[in-house]
Regions:
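Non-catalytic signal-transmission and effector/linker regions of two-component phosphorelay proteins
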Residues: 1-11, 42, 106-120
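The feature encodes the CheY-like receiver
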Residues: 62
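Charged docking surfaces used in two-component/phosphorelay signaling
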Residues: 21-25
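Conserved acidic carboxylate
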Residues: 14
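Short hydrophobic/Thr-rich beta-strand motif most characteristic of the beta2 strand and flanking loop
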Residues: 31-39, 46
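Active-site residues of response regulator receiver
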Residues: 58
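A Lys-centered signature of the CheY-like receiver
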Residues: 103
Length: 120
């Protein structure tokens, strides 16, 4: 059995508490350590310094966009996927080529996205 230190660490930026709790459980069951942030400031703090391997970023975090977090992750070479209920045309053009999990998504879609990030 893996110890927490051996598990890939994922930053989960999600402001909907119930969804965040469900995702945290699903991710932990799939073998990830999870660092959660529901607000942009906390997400930025974790993105800048935490030892994370990948991230799921809700685009809208309590009325603030997570694009600054994505810039930090990109600078650190940490892969990420956006999670959004927005239609593609509502995502700024500069970010449309990034991986986007369209809400609602299922376990299969989540696992495929995360596997793709880890293999990239």
């Amino acid at each position: 059995m893996s110890t927490d230190e051996n598990m890939p660490c994922i930053l989960l930026a999600e402001d909907e508490m119930l969804l965040a709790m469900m995702l945290e459980d699903r991710l932990h069951t799939s073998g990830y350590r999870v660092l959660k942030a529901a607000r942009l400031a906390k997400c930025m703090e974790l993105a800048e310094s935490a030892p994370i391997d990948l991230a799921i970023l809700d685009i809208n975090l309590a009325g603030e966009v997570s694009f600054p977090v994505a810039l930090v992750l990109r600078r650190r070479g940490i892969p990420f996927v956006f999670s959004s209920g927005y239609d593609e045309q509502d995502v700024p053009e500069a970010w449309r080529n990034e991986n986007i999990l369209q809400k609602p998504y299922d376990s299969r879609q989540l696992n495929a996205a995360l596997t793709g990030l880890l293999e990239a």
